[in-house]
Structures are given as structure tokens and as C-alpha cells.
From Swiss-Prot:
Keywords, in A-Z order: Membrane, Mitochondrion, Mitochondrion inner membrane, Transmembrane, Transmembrane helix
Mitochondrial matrix side: 1-13
Biological or metabolic pathway of the protein: Energy metabolism; oxidative phosphorylation
The keyword Manganese is annotated on this UniProt entry: no
Chain's role: Component of the cytochrome c oxidase, the last enzyme in the mitochondrial electron transport chain which drives oxidative phosphorylation. The respiratory chain contains 3 multisubunit complexes succinate dehydrogenase (complex II, CII), ubiquinol-cytochrome c oxidoreductase (cytochrome b-c1 complex, complex III, CIII) and cytochrome c oxidase (complex IV, CIV), that cooperate to transfer electrons derived from NADH and succinate to molecular oxygen, creating an electrochemical gradient over the inner membrane that drives transmembrane transport and the ATP synthase.
Protein name per the record: Cytochrome c oxidase subunit 6C
Organism: Nycticebus coucang
GO cellular component: mitochondrial inner membrane
Family: Belongs to the cytochrome c oxidase subunit 6c family.
One GO process term, biological-process aspect: oxidative phosphorylation
Signal sequence, start to end: none
Predominant location category: mitochondrion
Cellular compartment(s): Mitochondrion inner membrane
Length: 75
């Protein structure tokens, strides 16, 4: 009998195994995207803000806007 030589296919746990593999993959991808965002977007933005405010003179810009007539309550 040739049918007795064939092994039975595994039918239990297929979904659990597939979900386990995909959850690990999704976790790895999400960590990669988070690291990419941090170093490609957040860090350069933080550096740009720090560079801007290092030389920022709020009194100077206030006086420029006051002279230009932006503020109605300040003469």
C-alpha cells in the first residue's frame, strides 16, 4: 500500500506558528521604523531648533515687529 508510506500533514498549530513569525517580524519592522524616524527626522529637527535658539534675540525681533506696526497695542 503506497498510501501508508505518505506522512500525514500537520494540521494543528498552523495559525499559531504563522502568527508567531509575523508578530516577530512586525515587531522588528516597527523598531526599525522608530529608529529611522528618530535619527532621520527627530534628531536633525532638534539640532535645528537648538541652533536657532542659540542665537535668537527675542527683544530684537520684538522691536522689529513693533516698528513695522504688527502690534496694535504697542506703540
Amino acid at each position: 500500500m503506497a498510501s501508508s508510506a505518505l506522512a500525514k500533514p500537520q494540521m494543528r498549530g498552523l495559525l499559531a506558528r504563522r502568527l508567531r513569525i509575523h508578530i516577530v517580524g512586525a515587531f522588528v519592522v516597527s523598531l526599525g521604523v522608530a529608529a529611522f524616524y528618530k535619527y532621520a527626522v527627530a534628531e536633525p529637527r532638534k539640532k535645528a531648533y537648538a541652533d536657532f535658539y542659540r542665537n535668537y534675540d527675542s527683544v530684537k525681533y520684538f522691536e522689529e515687529m513693533r516698528k513695522a506696526g504688527v502690534f496694535q497695542s504697542v506703540k
